């Protein structure tokens, strides 16, 4: 089979992020230490072989000390490094049901939109934890609910509280500063201003941008993703453009070339004032404990005068 062109891989990656967003409407990751708080379920009923089809919940399980009970993960899990050795069972759009069932799970974390998979798991009498993500606050809410479900309530509550405290600290550092109008782009055809997809005024990306001291230039549109034309970008006149990259579609040495693509719109304030920023990292598209790192990087990009604390 011929290799897939890079620009098509980029489009596919952006489509996957849009699919993730559509499932709902300061420090890097650190695993907690200590024991597990047992939920109301009896200890013998707690899941011992968990399969997570959601990278965010995989990271949550590790954060609450339940990573040793994960029996399988999605093809898209990359963090923490321990996921590399775990069996892969497909993803949001292409779950491998046969492979999944062969691992004999006693709990499967699924996207709530995976209706066909949920029906098959129901027929197989496999317990499920449906996942639907919306805004920033849902990250810690999901962590706490998942902790109860797997019998790690105490550790999950502690991990969630740390995330909330770290996010609040970032918010305090940028409070009272001017909030630049920001366009947050998470999809674009490489080498051209085509197929531009940006964060609208709803969802965790919007929430993190606002917490980090930016004013979402599409904040009035209650959508998680917005397809942008050049005319729309010109009309919105963002003062800052942040473009997210993830995976291997763009090498760091090519960032300058991709940044120059925006020179096609010289009248846009962000372009004119050289405030187009390309950021790379899965923490921007995996709404789990590392969302703190995403918020930190947004804050330093939007407000470089504010040091990391």
For the regions a language model picked out, list residue spans one by one:
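Bacterial N-terminal signal peptides that target proteins for export
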Residues: 2-13
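Bacterial N-terminal signal peptides
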Residues: 12-23
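Boundary at the C-terminal end of the N-terminal hydrophobic targeting segment
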Residues: 24-30, 41-43
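Short helix-initiation/N-cap motifs at beta->coil->alpha
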Residues: 35-37, 89-98, 221-230
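Extracytoplasmic substrate-binding proteins
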Residues: 44-49, 116-193, 218-220, 271-309
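A short, structured surface patch at a secondary-structure boundary
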Residues: 48-103, 107-117, 217, 265
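Short helices/loops that flank or line small-molecule/ion binding pockets
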Residues: 97-104, 124, 228-237
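His/Asp/Glu-enriched short active-site or ligand-binding loop at hydrolase and phosphoryl-transfer sites
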Residues: 199-225, 243-245
């Amino acid at each position: 089979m011929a290799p897939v062109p890079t620009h098509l891989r980029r489009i596919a990656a952006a489509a996957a992020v849009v699919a993730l967003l559509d499932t709902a409407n300061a420090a890097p990751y650190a695993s907690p230490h200590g024991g597990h708080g047992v939920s109301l379920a009896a200890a013998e009923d707690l899941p011992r072989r968990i399969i997570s089809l959601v990278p965010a919940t995989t990271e949550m399980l590790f954060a609450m000390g339940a990573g040793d009970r994960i029996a399988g993960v999605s093809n898209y899990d990359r963090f923490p490094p321990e996921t590399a050795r775990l069996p892969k069972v497909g993803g949001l759009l292409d779950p491998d049901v046969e492979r999944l069932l062969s691992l004999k799970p006693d709990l499967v974390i699924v996207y709530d939109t995976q209706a066909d998979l949920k029906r098959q798991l129901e027929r197989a009498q496999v317990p499920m934890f449906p996942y639907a993500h919306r805004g920033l606050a849902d990250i810690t809410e999901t962590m706490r609910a998942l902790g109860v479900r797997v019998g790690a309530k105490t550790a999950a509550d502690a991990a969630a509280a740390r995330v909330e405290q770290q996010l609040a600290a970032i918010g305090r550092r940028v409070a009272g500063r001017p909030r630049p109008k920001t366009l947050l782009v998470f999809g674009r055809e490489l080498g051209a201003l085509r197929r531009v997809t940006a964060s609208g005024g709803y969802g965790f990306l919007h929430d993190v941008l606002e917490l980090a001291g930016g004013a979402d230039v599409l904040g009035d549109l209650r959508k998680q993703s917005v397809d942008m034309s050049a005319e729309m970008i010109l009309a919105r006149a963002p003062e800052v453009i942040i473009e997210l990259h993830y995976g291997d579609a763009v090498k760091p040495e090519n960032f300058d070339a991709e940044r120059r693509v925006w020179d096609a719109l010289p009248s846009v304030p962000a372009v004119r004032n050289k405030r187009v920023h390309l950021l790379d990292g899965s923490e921007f598209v995996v709404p789990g404990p590392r969302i703190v790192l995403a918020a930190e990087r947004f804050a330093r990009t939007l407000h470089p005068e504010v040091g990391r604390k």
